[in-house]
């Protein structure tokens, strides 16, 4: 989902039509279930939870703790967890995970 948010943010900054982008990319090698499921919701600013951000944070914390106990470094997990935690501090914990796009829309 982080990749989807970053791709949409980049495409938006380049002035691309995001609806066309979703239709084009979804049928190719860059397509994914995350893109199909959350891309349209993100474009509509539909942050109704299928899975609450606050619960996803809890799960990522457990995974991060387990990784550390196993002496495994999961840099992407740590970064994504920090991004979500920042949004939770801003009061977005009861939104769906697709609200991660709000992290990228900050001024």
Residue ranges, per PLM feature:
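Helical "substrate-binding/catalytic lid" subdomain
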Residues: 1-107
């Amino acid at each position: 989902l982080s990749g989807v948010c970053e791709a949409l943010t980049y495409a938006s900054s380049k002035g691309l039509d995001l609806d066309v982008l979703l239709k084009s990319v979804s049928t190719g090698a860059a397509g994914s279930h995350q893109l199909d499921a959350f891309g349209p919701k993100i474009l509509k600013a539909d942050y109704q939870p299928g899975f609450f951000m606050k619960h996803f944070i809890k799960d990522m914390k457990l995974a991060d703790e387990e990784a550390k106990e196993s002496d495994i470094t999961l840099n992407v997990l740590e970064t994504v967890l920090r991004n979500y935690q920042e949004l939770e501090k801003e009061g977005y914990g009861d939104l769906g995970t697709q609200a991660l796009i709000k992290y990228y829309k900050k001024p």
